[in-house]
Amino acid sequence: MDIVKSIDTSVDAVLDEFDCAYFAVTLKVEFKTGKQLVCIGFGDTLLEAKDKAYAKLGLSIIEEVNSHTVV
């Protein structure tokens, strides 16, 4: 079991030639052991991109008072 130290989120959006927006959400997870994990989700909406990025983590997260324990 690893403890998550931080999760950084960044969002990028682009417009195509038809003014349609597309989004990419990047999650950078840093564990207390020093390991890092990066997941990127793409979608037509910000929510879709965010949901896809978190789904790619594939982790069970148990929230504690000041930290997250990853199972």
Curated annotation (Swiss-Prot):
Name of protein: Non-structural protein 3a
Xref: InterPro entries: Coronavirus_Orf3 (IPR006784)
Annotated source species: Canine coronavirus (strain Insavc-1)
Pfam families documented for this protein: Corona_3 (PF04694)
